[in-house]
Amino acid sequence: MLACSLLLFAALGPSAGTKDTPPTATATAAETQPEADAAPSEASPEPSEADASDGEVNLLGRAKTGSGEGRRNENVQFNLIDNNAAKEAAIRLGTSATLVSEFAPERNYFSSELGAAPNGPVALRARTLGDWHGNVFWRHLNSATSARSFFQVGGVKPARENDYGFRVGRALWRGANFSVDASQRRIRGNVNGNVLVPRPDERTPLTDDPAERVLVQQMLDVFPTETPNRTDINERMLNTNAAQGIDDDSFTARFDQAWGDKNRVAMQYSYLQQLVDAFQLIRTQNPDTTTRSHRARITYGRTLSPTSELQLTTAFDRAASLLTPEESELETAVFVSTALTSFGNGSTIPIDRARNVFRHGALVRKTVGRHELTYGGEVFRRQVSGFEADAHRGAYSFNRAFGNDAVTNLRSGTASTYFLGVGNVHRGYRNWEGETFVGDRWSPTPGLDLNIGLRWGFLTPPTEVDELDGVAYDCDCNNFAPTFGFAYRLPHGAGRLRGGFGLHYGTIFDVTYMQIRYNSPNNAKLVIPTPDLLAPASDIDVSDLGSVRGVRYEITPELAAPYSMQYNLSWEFEPVSNWLLSLGYVGSRSPKLLAQWHLNRARIVEGIPTTLRTVNERRPDPTILDRRLVLNGSRGYFDAAKMDLTIPHWKGLSVRASYWFSKLMDLGTDYANTASNEDSWRARSQRVTDIHPDMKALSRFDSPHATLLRVAYALPRTGPRGSWRAAAFGNWTLSMVSLMKTGTPFNIEMGSDAPGLGNVDGLPGERPMLLDPSVHGATIGHPDTVLPREAFGFLEPGGAGDLGRNAFRKGPIRNVNASLARRWSLGGEAALTLRAESVNFFNTPQFAAPGTRLTDQNFGVITNTLNEGRTFRVGLDAAF
């Protein structure tokens, strides 16, 4: 269910007309005061009641600017699959400490204390419509008014973004309502970014073998002919531009019918599509992506009595993702440490996945005296099918080794490792998940409210439709989750005291268990050290995959859904009339977080040289290569103190200010870790023993200090009603959202497993020795600040670095978004709103982490930003 709570964007949001609203408060009448906490966001629609679905959708080009977020730098690439979009946002922005005022029994609040939205029942809420009403909107962003990003060379390249749509609805006949929402967004422009390319003197092969020279030249030719133009930062850095196109289409139709006062039915269908023609700063850098989502809901509601209500819902969700590599004569993926930008679209491409979820739920609400009872349940049937590569196109890794740097080894055709997947990995998995819940909200006295709830859930292991794989973990059928909370009105007007405790379960991700598809006898994952460049797998007979020595993916039989124990306490009071101040604490402990441990690493064996070439000879189990074990191998710790101040209306000004101080730690993996692909590499330990002491550190999402300020100001009328001055200067609203946060941590790695550098165990990722403790914990927040290479030392074979994980921080977030809006009333509900918005108004860069691999030339140097430069956007919204 964690997938639900991590929804970055959902197809069934509010009406299309609210999709890209800027940070301003929308007035409902000419004299309405703005609400600071109503500042909408630029991008993703917030989930509606129908969004409590199981299929997450990743989309590019969206930002929650109403929460102070800037537009992300598209050059920070991630694949639009799984929960990657949510993880990218959490790494870039950190956590947002959130106190839940009441744990509703029908909702799951796993990770909600960190800012993730809770998921809930699938039912559609009842609604009624009158005569024709709706709105039409259009918004435009143009590069002519955009500022350059920090590292950009030359002017801003042409780009434009158009977002438009409509919403319309009305009552058809007695008890019947119908509405349609539709929108499109078209982005045509250029992505600016930094890439590391060979110097002019590094554009030719060094190998003497003619055939190898051809292949090496193909690898070098993927880089643009432009020469490095930011040599002030790195001698190989090139700032350049590449075209990217994004097409978004969304459609929602809904029909409601009521029969009398007791019966009603609601039906809704939504479709969402995004097509991304990805930018290529270097050829074959990024895959093209097609994302499609279908969602259908039918809810029957019946009023059983004046004090009880029943809802029955059936739903179907389908999310399809297709990621395809750019066509090229070079089919393999290539990684050149971080000395050059990687190319070949990555080793996990292509991906062709379809996910169907059938949901059925029931919900009953009943009032008995002072008790408000809620009970019900849901059951899910999941179907996940498709093809997902794991180095099936092959992948070369060139690192600093053999006495050369990584670029020289590339030019010489001397790879450190070759990865290859061989076999059939098309699969279809099926499993069940369900939950029941009961809760009671009781008011024993006028000043005291109590709520208590209990959820029980189950999660079955998946089965493969053709019986190609067997998942060896048991049914997770003992997930009992109690909740308790209270709200007490203190005497003498001293405010209200709230507290709560809840146990909430996550889920086992599809991508977590689907890794077993890469095992023999139907597939083999090969890891070949020091391969022959032209025939890296020539010595391996792949005719019988069952006998091939490959990587083994295992899942512990005790694998279970992670869970979190969340607790909070807050005091709300009015320091002055109509002002609300809240002081609170929230914390959680999250056992059984998913992790992947890399075992069967090479040891120091007497009589065998400790080199990269002998890695596979020195593994304890001679029948396999790397052993990758998925288990509940981590634990999360979170504590935060938070203060909120709300000033609703004060001389035309509305303010909501928040500050929180928090600490987030884990034992190697966090609540969003899927224990697969890049997540598994991020969490690898230095050794196979003492893993938890080695990995315990700050989480990659940790951001201890944060301030969020929302301000909306309604400009006063300057003349009599109806005068030209009132018409020109009245009904203007100025809004501002400011987000200031400490940067999130980053990790330092050795960058090479070679003798004299790393520990030669066949797995990269070990950390260096810390020679200068004065740099420990430093913030590297500006290109003028460099992490000194001489502060770190290399390892002995079989050793481990003494530098802790995530020991340094990126620079802070200092972002301000602003907007100016004018509303004209056209009579009745008709109105026209003009809005101008700026994101990153002061053009403040948020810098990415510096180079993190000690053996690379760009170590310790910042070469990228995480946000775009300042942008302006205008929009019109006509409501009727």
Name what the model sees in each region:
Residues 699-700, 718-720, 729-827, 833, ...:
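Extracytoplasmic gating/loop element in the C-terminal half of outer-membrane beta-barrel translocons
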Residues 29-294, 304-306, 318-322, 331-339, ...:
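Acidic, glycine-rich flexible loop segments
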Residues 333-334, 464-481, 485-631, 687, ...:
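Solvent-exposed loop/turn elements at secondary-structure boundaries
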Residues 761, 765, 808-809, 846-880:
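C-terminal beta-signal and terminal closure region of outer-membrane beta-barrel proteins
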